[in-house]
Amino acid sequence: MIRITRSGVYYRSGAFLSEEEGRTAGLPAPAQAREGTMAYGILKAHNTLDTMDRLAIRFDAMASHDITYVGIIQTARASGLTEFPLPYVLTNCHNSLCAVGGTINEDDHVFGLSAAKKYGGEFVPAHQAVIHSYMRERYAAPGKMILGSDSHTRYGAYGTMAIGEGGPELARQLLRKTYDIAYPKVIGIHLTGAPRPGVGPQDVALAIIGATFREGVVKNAVMEFFGPGVGSLSMDYRSGIDVMTTETACLSSVWSTDETTRAHLTALGRGEEFKAQAPADGAWYDGLLEVDLSTVEPMIALPFHPSNAYTIREFKANARELLRQVEADAAEQLGIKGAAPLTDKLVNGQFRVDQGVIAGCSGGTYQNLVRAAQILKGSAIGPDEFWLSCYPGSMPINLELTRQGYIADLMAAGASIRSCFCGPCFGAGDVPANGAFSIRHSTRNFPNREGSKPGEGQISYVALMDARSIASTARNGGVLTGADELPDCPADQKDESWSYDDSAYRSRVYFGVGKAKPETELVYGPNIADWPEQIPLPENLLLTAAAAIYDPVTTTDELIPSGETSSYRSNPLRLSEFALSRKDPQYVPRAKAILAEERKRRAGEATDALMGRDPKTTGLGSFVMALKPGDGSAREQAASCQRVLGGCANLCAEFATKRYRSNVVNWGMLPFIAEDVKDWNIQPGDQLYLPGIRAALERGEESVQAVLIQNGAERPVTLKLPGITQEEREIILAGCLINYYAK
């Protein structure tokens, strides 16, 4: 199905050559041949430096949704923002229901509209579109770069390199600064063949994620898609694969373009933006995935990660064993005990699920919902436990589905049709019952992301599947069914397009790009608060572990939950009360106790917490130890909540993603690496003393000597800061990005 080459290769005349074979054939050295990739050309066009070893990128456009844009604008405003210097789209597709916290969700939306008017932005009201559906329809085009404050900012299928980052990186662009990274690895994704009937984009995506995530095959790299298989796919199909590349932990993605791309852009009214884009003959890739689309089968990603992927055929053959493993994972990772066995859902050898959802930037495309409607037409979901909801990704998609009768077919079969928002993807809609098993064409199935509360003894399970197999399961009354098991499963066509009508946007969207109205007053609700002040890095630090997490991977959903908690993201202090609440409920009290002692120190009061050290030169703070933190969402609050609670560092064996590490740094925390940290057996209450830490950063050191204090015993340890840049040092020294720009 998928063949992986970890070493570099040349792409020449449709074949791949090793470095040695390329040398024999007279090809340029890899450093020169890399210029033949699509990624190189796009990055070079957006790089403001003379070198390509380090990049300082300016983007063509940006996008944020309603649980990130308030913090971004507040950060930029505190640093001197006067207008948006590039197109900035503010969507309202997360807290769209305004169902939690009284007025606070709609207060954020009102603030967003006032900011779009004041600074010159584009404002998409609630229920009009999911952020990524909107950006595909309105902005993505070959050769562009787009930055979004959502990790699934991926428009590679359009030839756009899009990157999802934490809010501070967007604030930098608003302040006319650059996005600074080392030149990334570029991994070739060579597609051949064509998908079978019943195999959808989520199936291809899950197969790729399952093959790459655990070994970090494409971590922090650009995934570059090309090959004859691209031509067999529609634009919706390509986008469905592309948006899920985030779950591989890659940095970005880009695809070759063709007449299908041109036709789609023309249908969107932007045909003039088309450019032909393909790798040059002899291009060098740092690694390679060869994917034969014809071999991909319907897939299922079991809880609790998209990489926990199996073919539906494999799952059915080993259901009891695999379900018991899910139960074991729930007990180990979530501390859930006494839950009803998942194996109880095996009835006469068939696995019965409780809920189906097709939603968002991955599931809610036109083609996915057409396939679901065709599969369900004339059938009935039935009156038992199983139910299905469908969320079109945008009003233009919804409008065309309605005009063509597909919405009626879905409704007649018993599916619920919801508005265009992201709710079930992050726990703000369709939360399953306790013990229920939901199958979803959405982006993630992390623990509790669907909205369950483990602190209250709740557990529900989410598996990822393609819309085609979800609809097939619905047609079969909730019995898990791969779409390829249907005798009449409709096939996908590469030229399958839809009539784009943006009248809903023209009727409701505020189009203010380049039309700043400085006299406009920002409208603040009572929950919208400024960022708390942070102090510069002290000369020395005494840090106490407020949490120690030994899971193989820690997600941003665990660091700061989504769902109803997201309603408080405009209030940093209030939101911080939820940090790690589902993973370690004692984290916040521990961190606050340490912060209270630090506040005493700053006020000149005596504190025993310093253990005799000079209060004028030694600061107190907390740190989080996790083996591999930061997989998942780009939300800056995963780091900012720690900082608001007095956090000064993360200590890990490795960071799961570049974007989370950037959030840690931009919020003034030290991103420490110790590959053998698991062996240190750090527990909450253990301490790290960092003498001369400020001077070490000022000297440019990439490792610092510290003292680990456990149960009264002290021993020296080395903490590494690999790859830390001069600007990152200065941000940490200043205390955070806001302080750095205020200098």
Question: Where do the model's predicted regions map?
Answer:
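Fe-S-dependent hydro-lyases/dehydratases of central metabolism
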Residues: 1-743
